[in-house]
A protein has these predicted regions:
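A short, conserved, highly charged catalytic patch centered on acidic carboxylates
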Residues: 1-74, 85-139
Length: 139
């Protein structure tokens, strides 16, 4: 939650940050994403959190399942140290298998800080950030 707070969102306001948002997946009902950043009652960023010792490669399919049944354009998978940002550049509404941005907070670079700022509540624009994701992914 400190990261979400650093992005300018009120973690105690469910209109901004919805914890345990239900993402029904086919016959699997009641599946929940850890957090959803909301705007105008719609999820714009899904966040799946894992223990800091967890290998994120073991959990990207979980985020993919949630992403594919939601209207969110961005997904974030994190263990609190590594932050992987995903979107659907290859095929609409299907999360890409590779993140367009990966940040290790123990080794932050200036250009990564600039990219993270785009997800701050004051600047987050889904369409502009989608264009930025495309530029990052194909660099």
């Amino acid at each position: 939650m400190p990261f979400i707070n650093a992005l300018g969102y009120d973690v105690f306001n469910p209109l901004e940050v919805l914890p345990e948002m239900t993402c029904d997946i086919g016959t699997k009902k009641g599946e929940k994403i850890d957090y959803a950043i909301m705007k105008d009652d719609q999820p714009i960023l899904l966040i799946e959190c894992k223990h800091w010792k967890q290998d994120l490669n073991l959990h990207d399919n979980q985020l993919l399942r949630y992403f594919n049944v939601s209207k969110a354009k961005f997904g974030l998978l994190t263990n609190g140290i590594i932050y992987r940002f995903y979107t659907d550049l290859k095929e609409p509404n299907i999360m890409d298998d590779k993140p367009f941005l990966e940040v290790d907070i123990t080794d932050l670079r200036d250009n990564q800080i600039e990219e993270l700022k785009k997800f701050h509540k004051s600047y987050f624009d889904v369409d502009n950030d989608f264009s930025s994701a495309s530029e990052l992914k194909y660099m």
